[in-house]
From Swiss-Prot:
GO terms for cellular component: plasma membrane. It is found in: Cell inner membrane. Keywords: Antibiotic resistance, Cell inner membrane, Cell membrane, Membrane, Signal-anchor, Transmembrane, Transmembrane helix, Transport. It comes from the Bacteria. GO terms for biological process: response to antibiotic; xenobiotic detoxification by transmembrane export across the plasma membrane. The chain crosses the membrane at residues 13-33. Signal peptide: none annotated. Disulfide bonds: none annotated. The keyword Transmembrane helix applies. Could be involved in resistance to puromycin, acriflavine and tetraphenylarsonium chloride. Its main location: membrane. This is Multidrug resistance protein MdtN. The keyword Lyase does not apply.
Length: 343
């Protein structure tokens, strides 16, 4: 009987090599994920402002369309300036009339001031006369008892003293009248300052009727047209600040230990995943709303009981500034993938 030949034992080296390579690859992937975190839970974003008119009026010119790119200083829209132009003309006319009134009043005041100076001199003269009459009466009255003067002479002295006092009072009233006339110009000058303030405010309102782009951006959410009445402080549309784009990437809290402000990043947008953009970490979020607890009632946190032994890492937003964004690709809310390279 012929004996069957024994099969040669298979070598285990290739299988061991494959297992070893798989382990090495697994270790590399784990190290890479831990040292260079990546996430596809990210989106592009930019700062926005609501474009609001600061004055009310009907829109007479709308220089932009929805989703249009604009440059700083470009005209966005114009509100009917005619009411503000009329207010400005009215205020300027009031100022001109007030200037004429001040000029005429000043002439009158100058004349009254000259008269007031004359009255002041008359006051001093009347005061001296009244003093002299009082002194004469004071000297004459004792002489009547001695018989050196007659009663008639004393009466004349009293009459002279009373007349001098009356003259003095009349002159004092004239002086007060002249002083009040001078103060009337001060009131007109103050009124002129108020009119000038009205003119400045009206010019500002007229300037505000023309709204221009405060920075390079893109118009969105435009839902109005010429003829619409615009109310002050009510948004007309939104303007995206396209000068600075950034990506909000939500990383697991276990990935945050090596992430710092300035950490280099590589960004890809899903609209064109073959193109990459460089960036740097700007900041890391310090607060998110938890999904399953933390409700505060009466000052004490209410924590729900849990029998779930699997803990899912919380994600925190990381803001990544993009160095040279493509203005045609970046849109607010665009899906992105972020890869970080901690140093």
């Amino acid at each position: 009987m012929e004996s069957t030949p024994k099969k040669a034992p298979r070598s285990k080296f290739p299988a061991l090599l494959v297992v070893a390579l798989a382990l090495v690859a697994l270790v590399f992937v784990i190290w890479r994920v831990d040292s260079a975190p990546s996430t596809n839970d990210a989106y592009a974003s930019a700062d926005t402002i609501d474009v609001v008119p600061e004055v009310s009026g009907r829109i007479v010119e709308l220089a932009v369309t929805d989703n249009q790119a604009v440059k700083q200083g470009d005209l966005l829209f114009r509100i009917d300036p005619r009411p503000y132009e009329a207010n400005l003309a009215k205020a300027e006319a009031s100022l001109a009339a007030l200037d004429k009134q001040i000029m005429l009043t000043q002439r009158s005041v100058d004349a009254q001031q000259f008269g007031a100076d004359s009255v002041n001199a008359t006051v001093e003269k009347a005061r001296a006369a009244a003093k002299q009459a009082s002194d004469t009466l004071r000297r004459t009255e004792p002489l009547l008892r001695e018989g050196f003067v007659s009663a008639e002479e004393v009466d004349r002295a009293r009459t002279a003293q009373r007349a001098a006092e009356a003259d003095l009072n009349a002159v004092l009233l004239q002086a007060q009248s002249a002083a009040s006339a001078v103060s009337g110009v001060d009131a007109l000058v103050a009124q002129r300052a108020a009119v000038e303030a009205d003119i400045a405010l009206t010019k500002l309102h007229l300037e505000m009727a023309t709204v221009r782009a405060p920075f390079d951006g893109r118009v969105i959410s435009l839902k109005t047209s010429v003829g619409q009445f615009a109310s002050a402080m009510r948004p007309i549309f939104t303007l995206i600040d396209t000068r600075h784009w950034y990506v909000i990437a939500n990383f697991r809290e276990t990935d945050l230990k090596n992430i710092r402000s300035g950490t280099p990043a590589t960004i890809r947008l899903m609209s064109d995943s073959g193109k990459t953009f460089e960036g740097k970490v700007d900041s890391i979020g310090y607060g998110v709303l938890p999904d399953d607890g933390g409700l505060v009632l009466g000052g004490l946190p209410k924590v729900s009981r849990s029998i779930n032994w699997v803990r899912v890492a919380q994600r925190f937003p990381v803001k990544i500034m993009v160095d040279k964004p493509d203005p045609e690709m970046f849109r607010i809310g665009a899906s992105a993938v972020a890869n970080l390279e901690p140093q």
